Amino acid sequence: GGGFIGIEIAENLIEMGLDTILIELNNQILAPVDFEIAKIAQDEMIKKGVNLILSDGVQKFSENQIILNSNNAIDYDLCILAIGVKPETDLARKAGLETNRGIIVDEYLKTSNEFIYAAGDNIEAKDFVSGQNTLLPLAGPANRQGRIVADNICGFNSTYKNTQGTSVVKIFDLTVASSGNNEKQLKQKEIPYWKTYVYGRSHAGYYPNSDMILYKLLFSNDGKILGIQGVGESGVEKRVDVIATIMRNNGTVQDMIDAELCYAPPYSSAKDPVNILGMSADNILKGLVKPAYFEDLKDAVVIDVRPNMIYKMGTIDGAINIPITEIRSRLDEIPRDKKVILSCNTGYTSYCASRILAQKGFNNVYSFMGGYELYKVLVKESAKLNHA
């Protein structure tokens, strides 16, 4: 299983010096996040020695062999099942309580029997983003639910205000954190959304030991925050916690811009990644930039606006090079009748170039969100990754 428990166990087995294989039925580990975030975590696990098998599951066990759905056989000495949890609702059903996948409760965590409350991993709580019933086995919500039940038994009329699914996991030297819905969930629920990617620093880049963090923000047309994901070495969960708190208070991307957070070079930048994410989203909503994503590249003219020396070190397949410093003098090389996507290293320079071209009358220009750094994540083949 490639969830939190499976990953944590795999890390500890590697630290003990054991040969470790992790098998996951889906095409990625970590279901709460989208593929591009999970891909960075997968590469970290492979780098540390975990043999990852994705898009495959266990068909059967023998005494010392596992047979996979692909009919491949794996010898083993120890097998650990970390394949998730399922609510135990037998007692609730026998008591005549209304159940679905879990026990049905109202906002007071009261079941269909007014004298019985339920809390924890066996209840269906409402999703904070969609309002739909969901199962989210997380310790934080379960503990708060216990207090709410105690309050209501004592007559304080406390309500549970839905589950965001805020979570974090350590994967060797990386941290992955998220809150709200991911892109897959928004598509399944048919919730309209925008997305942006920002590479931010754990603290000021000119201060030693600054790490790069990739963030993915999902938001609605009116600026409501629908989901946040991040992966990096340090400072990830701090920013996700801040954005989760803004979400909890029904804040918007504008509130992310306005957030006044701690700043000193060892801890952050004058414009924290939370602020930058809000600004990037706000630019999209105001029409200051047209965002483009990996799936848009194949149908467009791609222009890399980085210096030629950097362009030659690696670029998006098929991209031509017009450095931003030359773009005003080379307008005649840029088509006006085709979709043009500008790319740089992480998305900032391509945004600036898109603004220059917009002021020159180009209305067919897009900025590739996340830039070449994100592109490398998505196209790079993981060494030792096995698929069914």
Model-identified regions with their sequence ranges:
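Rhodanese-like catalytic fold shared by cysteine-dependent sulfurtransferases
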Residues: 254-301, 307-341, 345-388
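FAD-site-proximal beta/loop scaffold in flavoenzymes
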Residues: 67, 73-148, 242-246
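Mid-to-C-terminal Rossmann-like scaffold of FAD/NAD(P)H-dependent oxidoreductases
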Residues: 122-234, 265, 269, 273-300
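Conserved SAM/SAH-binding loop
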Residues: 55-59, 63, 70, 324-326
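Rossmann-like dinucleotide-binding cores of NAD(P)H-dependent redox enzymes
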Residues: 4-60, 138-141, 159-184, 383-385
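A short, polar/charged loop-to-alpha-helix boundary motif
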Residues: 234-253
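Glycine-rich Rossmann-fold phosphate-binding loop(s) that bind the pyrophosphate
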Residues: 1-3, 346
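Residues at the starts of beta-strands that form the adenosine-phosphate
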Residues: 18-21, 51, 115, 339, ...
